[in-house]
Amino acid sequence: VFVDPIHESMDALSVAYSLLKSHEVIDLLIIMLGTNDVKERFNANAACIGAGMERLILKAKSVDCWGTRAPNILVVAPPRIGDGFHDAVMGEGCVEKSKGVAEQFRIVAERQNVHFLNAADCEFNQVDFMHLTRKGHAQLADLLAKKVPTLL
């Protein structure tokens, strides 16, 4: 959600309207964000990152892209950053902050009456300790294959 002064166009909020309108009618919006928001330069804790997700959900709900149906949104919490990760760009504390993101997203999803899926157990790589491996992508695909049909 946060505007990154180093990496252009990394904030979902500023592009949400155009993306949703260009793909209407939306049957199901799946949002899997949050890892970049733990960067030290944003000075945001897990609760603040959850508030950012809530703001994005509210934005998505407000866009006239749902046809005659109510907004149907699935929030997917990404795996937490691995303990072996140390990177100057992400900054100190990103590993610890990432541990609380899934719970905050669950709370926000419940409050906003949207769906929630925790991808915490999907395997991430040992290079940047954030992005999914081939196996992790397969695990996420399995989770989504079970969840998505129940939402449509």
Tell where the protein language model's regions lie, with residue ranges.
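Acidic/histidine-rich helix-loop elements
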Residues: 1-11
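Alpha-helical cap/lid subdomain in secreted, periplasmic
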Residues: 9-152
